[in-house]
Amino acid sequence: MVKETHRFEPFTEEPIRLIGEEGEWLGDFPLDLEGEKLRRLYRDMLAARMLDERYTILIRTGKTSFIAPAAGHEAAQVAIAHAIRPGFDWVFPYYRDHGLALALGIPLKELFGQMLATKADPNKGRQMPEHPGSKALNFFTVASPIASHVPPAAGAAISMKLLRTGQVAVCTFGDGATSEGDWYAGINFAAVQGAPAVFVCENNFYAISVDYRHQTHSPTIADKAHAFGIPGYLVDGMDVLASYYVVKEAVERARRGEGPSLVELRVYRYGPHSSADDDSRYRPKEEVAFWRKKDPIPRFRRFLEARGLWNEEWEEDVREEIRAELERGLKEAEEAGPVPPEWMFADVFAEKPWHLLRQEALLKEEL
């Protein structure tokens, strides 16, 4: 449990970092997380990576039609999930956040059901893959248009303030979203209203193929917070503890009524932007290899090993548990069966109007 706040200064020139490349502790305060918590963070990162790998298998075997690889984002996404109160606070995610969804507690059956458009999908197969949502966990259904979820996140946070619920809205997005008008409008309004919101940029340096340095003249995305009059934090997003502590501090700051923050978590996506992208056309292999050496999972593994919290036997046990969970979740999603065609007419009106009833009848005749 985090015992203090205000540990970090905003607008630093270098990313905030707590774990060194060899796993050494760099913090100027004592680590106050218990061993089981640290192990859970690592397990969730492994699960996120293994889920990402399973999604790749789904696309290559023709079982789904689209994926947005997130390998390299694990530390950032798991940290966000652990920094909030699941099922109480709200999350407004973006399309690469399946690791965040899993760490938050969305069942694998639902995640796979959404990817396969089976009856296991709470959205009833109406969204394209990589667009999960969870009413139970206050996980806003992913929206495709870039940054379009930022104004709703601001609005939700304002309502939380007016109703004095004590909740916080956390909104995530990629670096490309920061070039959209909705992004500026949403954060500006949240700042003006002093809303309990935390806006988190998972900056992987590319908006599909466009280098973020070609999108903005601002030295960092965190620096954009100056325009809104809110604090902006630049963080090594491949450092799970730095990401956790900074996001946690921003969340609790918002919960105390001190307004929103902007957090830039610098990460690197190891795969293409999506299954429809060839990243070799715009990223040199040497660049990818450089960032591979900074993989957040081995880095945190070294940190745990130095504290006697990791060994190869424990790692294999954890991997086997995750493999079994993935197999079970996928099996349950597939066995749920495809969504029936008539579901497309449900949940549109409280009472179906005549024209929908007529269309439904015509469809049944054709089938």
Curated annotation (Swiss-Prot):
Any single Pfam family the record assigns to this protein: E1_dh
Reaction equations catalysed: N(6)-[(R)-lipoyl]-L-lysyl-[protein] + 3-methyl-2-oxobutanoate + H(+) = N(6)-[(R)-S(8)-2-methylpropanoyldihydrolipoyl]-L-lysyl-[protein] + CO2
Residues involved in substrate binding: 66, 95, 128-131, 144
Positions contributing to thiamine diphosphate binding: 94-96, 144-146, 174-180, 204-208, 273
Signal peptide bounds: none
CDD domains assigned: TPP_E1_PDC_ADC_BCADC
Reported cofactor(s): thiamine diphosphate
Positions contributing to Mg(2+) binding: 175, 204, 206
Entry superkingdom: Bacteria
Gene Ontology biological-process annotations: branched-chain amino acid catabolic process
Oligomeric form and interacting partners: Heterotetramer of two alpha and two beta chains. Directly associated with ODBB in the E1 complex.
Function, as annotated: The branched-chain alpha-keto dehydrogenase complex catalyzes the overall conversion of alpha-keto acids to acyl-CoA and CO(2). It contains multiple copies of three enzymatic components: branched-chain alpha-keto acid decarboxylase (E1), lipoamide acyltransferase (E2) and lipoamide dehydrogenase (E3).
Family: Belongs to the BCKDHA family.
The name this protein goes by in its record: 2-oxoisovalerate dehydrogenase subunit alpha
